[in-house]
C-alpha cells in the first residue's frame, strides 16, 4: 500500500471519528437541554409497566405488540379492569340505562361475531355520548361499562394530546387510535368532552383546529372498518360539542337528576350496610332530597352518619381508644330519620332550607 493511500485512509478514519464524536456530543447536549426528556422517559417507563399488567389481565402476548414512541406515551393512560372499583350493581336508580348499555353497546362490543350481521346494523356503535347535570353518574356508567366488558380503557385528557412542538399533537392523536385498534376491544373515554371537542370557531388556535381535524379523521377510519373501538364522551354541556363530533356519536344517553323512585334506590344502595332505626322514614328522606344528584345524595348520607359519630366524640371527649372500643362493641347508634334533617346533613350540602 503506497503512502498516499495510507494517508487517505487515515484521514477518512479521523474524519469519521470526529463526525461520530461530534454527533454524539450534540445528541447528549440536546438531550440534556430538553426540559421534557425526563418526563418522556418516565412516561415510557410507566407505559411499559401498564402494558405488562394489561397483557397479564387480557392473557395476550405482549411480544407481538409493536408500539412506537407515541403509542407508548398514550399507553401510560391505560386503566385496567381490575383497577376499576365500580360495577353496574353499584349504580342505583339507572336500571333502564344499564339495560340499554348492555344491549346496544356491551354485548356487541364483547361478542362481535354474534352482532356483526344484517349489514353491521347491530354492531357496536363507534361513538357514545352521556350527558346530564354534574354528579348524576355519567363517569360511573363509563367505568362500569369498561369493567363489565373487560375492554381496554384509555382515559384521555386534553393534556395528553397537546404538545408544544408543531406536529407532535397530531402524532399523539394518531397513536391514540392506532393503539386502541391494537388493544381492542377498547373504550376511549373523554370526560368533559365539550372542553376538548367544542364548537369550532374562527378564533380557534391553528394547532387546536388541526388536533380536532386529525381526531375526526382517525375516528372516520373506525367508522369505515370493523374495529371494536368505542369513543365514549361525557358532558353536562352537550350544546357546546362540535356538530361534526355529535354526528359521530349516534348513541346518546341523557342522565337527568334522579326521580323519587331512583333516589330511593340510591339511598338504599348507600345505606345497605348502615343500621337504621325501626321506623326509619324512607319516603320523608326521599322527598327531602328532591332535586339532588346521586353524588349529593351520597354526601347527605355521609353527613347524616356523622351525627351519631359526633355524639360519640362528645361522649368520650376525643378519646380515640374509647371511641374505637365503643364503635367495635356496637356503641354507634342506629341512624335516625331526623339525622338527615340536620343542618349540616342537608342544608349545607344542597342549599335547601329545611327549617
From Swiss-Prot:
Q: Which Pfam families match?
A: AAA
Keyword Mitochondrion in the entry? The reply is yes
Q: Which PROSITE patterns match?
A: AAA
Q: Name one GO molecular function term.
A: membrane protein dislocase activity
Q: Which UniProt keywords apply?
A: ATP-binding, Mitochondrion, Nucleotide-binding
Q: Say which species the protein is native to.
A: Schizosaccharomyces pombe (strain 972 / ATCC 24843)
Q: Which protein family is named in the record?
A: Belongs to the AAA ATPase family.
Q: Which domain of life is it from?
A: Eukaryota
State the disulfide connectivity.
none
User: What is the protein name stated in its UniProt record?
Assistant: Uncharacterized AAA domain-containing protein C24B10.10c
